[in-house]
């Protein structure tokens, strides 16, 4: 029987998950298909029901459902529990399990750059579903200080309840940092801009955007223009997908140059 896997989100058009997972599915001769699905909040319950009935065999979750989907699940992995964020779902022993592969994805993507962020200061822009994963990964890497800024300050305050060590700063305010991470969806559209003083802050600072499609957002373009070191979210995306693939298929897919180049759009 051919198994069905989906990535759900809203928006979802930008997602390259099907391209990557179907490449690995074909490479490892797995009888499965992987598709993307634009979802409305009202459809979550039906979707989980279809996993129970094994009409769907696994899900990846993206914006804005990483927290929203938790009440519909039976159990969370340790990573999903501490982050309160789910990006991978599967059925085991008649239970629907939520897991988080973003923590590992972000951590590995950082460790494989030449940027050493241990004992450094990081500023995170955003307070959505992926941010808790980034905070946990940064702590594992032994970052010294985490600042957080979000357009809606209430969301940032909510996050601080779980991570009291972070310091909230006002949106648009600039501070001294070594690394800045765009964890918002600002950049998915070509005209999207994050209004910060790039000229003042960019030189020799590390700019990381979790967005991987487009491969270079205005955030990264502006940073590069003024001497910043830039990295998009492609490797984070690949490493989180690698772990999700292993959860579902018990195969660790190879991440080689062909895999990486596959996602160049």
From Swiss-Prot:
The keyword Amino-acid biosynthesis applies. Transmembrane segments: none annotated. InterPro entries: Aminoacid_DH-like_N_sf (IPR046346), NAD(P)-bd_dom_sf (IPR036291), Shikimate_DH (IPR011342), Shikimate_DH-bd_N (IPR013708), Shikimate_DH_fam (IPR022893), Shikm_DH/Glu-tRNA_Rdtase (IPR006151). GO terms for molecular function: NADP binding; shikimate 3-dehydrogenase (NADP+) activity. The active site is at residue 66. NADP(+) binds at residues 78, 126-130, 150-155, 210, 233. SUPFAM superfamilies: Aminoacid dehydrogenase-like, N-terminal domain (SSF53223), NAD(P)-binding Rossmann-fold domains (SSF51735). GO terms for biological process: amino acid biosynthetic process; aromatic amino acid family biosynthetic process; chorismate biosynthetic process; shikimate metabolic process. It catalyses: shikimate + NADP(+) = 3-dehydroshikimate + NADPH + H(+). Pathway: Metabolic intermediate biosynthesis; chorismate biosynthesis; chorismate from D-erythrose 4-phosphate and phosphoenolpyruvate: step 4/7. Involved in the biosynthesis of the chorismate, which leads to the biosynthesis of aromatic amino acids. Catalyzes the reversible NADPH linked reduction of 3-dehydroshikimate (DHSA) to yield shikimate (SA). Homodimer. Belongs to the shikimate dehydrogenase family. This is Shikimate dehydrogenase (NADP(+)).
